[in-house]
């Protein structure tokens, strides 16, 4: 079957029919990727442009699937930006919050894995999509703005550290998490509570996306109430592998309001659950990979130099409320502390 005929055929499927044939469609696309890999660049570009054109006539959820194929196979930023704009513009009735969140993680992960996919607008689009999703989840939970626990009521010796994934110590982000917790508890004398929100590459509500990637999750950690690291013992909680779960988010907010930590440290960013909790106590986000776009908290610590929109060469974060650019060099901030 020729490519054009194949696209025309699947474009006639409704969503149920598409998912029933999803494995076959993915197999056909994988075979097409192998064929495209043997062609000259000009031929490959022509075929991808044909697919892009035909995708324009498809339902938006199907268009996202086909554009994700074009993005990964072309290895060019143009398709990344078109895909992100398609997700941003998609009506909630066609692509809901959970599906858009899954798309956010899939695209961000692809860009992190292959820097060639990142264009001039990619980071801006990821940030806009994250903010859109954060606002949607806040709306679902009835959260209308920051409502901090009064500073005089907060426990100055208690810090909540949240992250979207906890694996073994050979996993670099987990090691970063434990290193930060060690500094806070052993050297700064804080009581640290670690919460794995399990929001990393959420598969809940995932829609069609080419070569979908999944995050690691260790269910056995749900049975632990503490973690030991270099002689320190940390209180530990892990969310079930069904995030984002609105009931679980409410429970975490209630825990924040009841235990009243002095602040919340979000390791990794791009964690809507952590950012929602950050509406009730000050939140500091420590980025790890592509997560610089994904933070809503009051402050952020970036681990690499970032281009400042004001022209400053230092690292920067932007206050989403005031639009003020707060610039500083944060290369060694956490290590020195």
Task: Give, region by region, the residue ranges found by the protein language model.
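Short, charged/polar "capping" segments at the starts of alpha-helices
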Residues: 201-209, 273, 293, 308-313
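Conserved nucleotide-sugar phosphate-binding/catalytic loop shared by glycosyltransferases and other
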Residues: 208-245
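Active-site-proximal region of nucleotide-activated glycan assembly enzymes
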Residues: 117-125, 280-336
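Structural motif
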Residues: 72, 162-166, 196-199, 240-241, ...
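Alpha/beta-hydrolase active-site loop
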Residues: 242-256
């Amino acid at each position: 079957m020729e490519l054009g005929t194949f696209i025309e055929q699947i474009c006639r499927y409704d969503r149920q029919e598409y998912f029933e044939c999803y494995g076959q469609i993915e197999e056909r696309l994988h075979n097409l990727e192998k064929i495209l890999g043997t062609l000259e660049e000009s031929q490959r570009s022509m075929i991808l442009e044909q697919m892009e054109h035909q995708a324009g006539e498809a339902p938006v959820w199907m268009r996202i699937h086909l554009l994700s194929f074009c993005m990964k196979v072309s290895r060019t930023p143009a398709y990344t930006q078109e895909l992100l704009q398609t997700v941003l513009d998609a009506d909630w009735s066609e692509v809901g919050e959970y599906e858009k969140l899954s798309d956010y993680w899939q695209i961000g992960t692809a860009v992190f894995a292959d820097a060639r996919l990142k264009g001039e607008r990619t980071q801006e689009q990821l940030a806009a999509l994250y903010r859109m999703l954060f606002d949607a989840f806040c709306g679902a939970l009835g959260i209308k703005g920051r409502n901090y626990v009064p500073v005089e009521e907060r426990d100055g010796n208690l810090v909540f550290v949240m992250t979207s994934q906890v694996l073994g110590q050979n996993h670099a982000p987990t090691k970063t998490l434990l290193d930060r917790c060690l500094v806070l508890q052993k050297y700064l004398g804080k009581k640290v509570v670690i919460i794995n929100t399990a929001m990393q590459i959420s598969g809940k509500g995932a829609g069609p996306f080419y070569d979908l990637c999944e995050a690691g999750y260790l269910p056995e950690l749900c049975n632990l109430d503490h973690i030991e690291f270099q002689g320190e013992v940390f209180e530990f909680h892990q969310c079930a592998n069904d995030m984002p779960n609105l009931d679980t988010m409410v429970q975490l907010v209630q825990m924040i309001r009841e235990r009243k930590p002095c602040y919340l440290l979000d390791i990794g960013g791009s964690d809507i659950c952590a950012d929602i909790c950050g509406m009730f106590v000050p939140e500091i986000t420590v980025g790890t990979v592509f997560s610089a776009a994904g933070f809503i908290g009051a402050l952020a610590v970036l681990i690499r130099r970032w281009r400042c929109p004001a022209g400053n060469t230092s690292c920067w974060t932007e206050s989403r409320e005031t639009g003020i650019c707060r610039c500083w060099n944060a290369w060694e901030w956490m290590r020195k502390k």
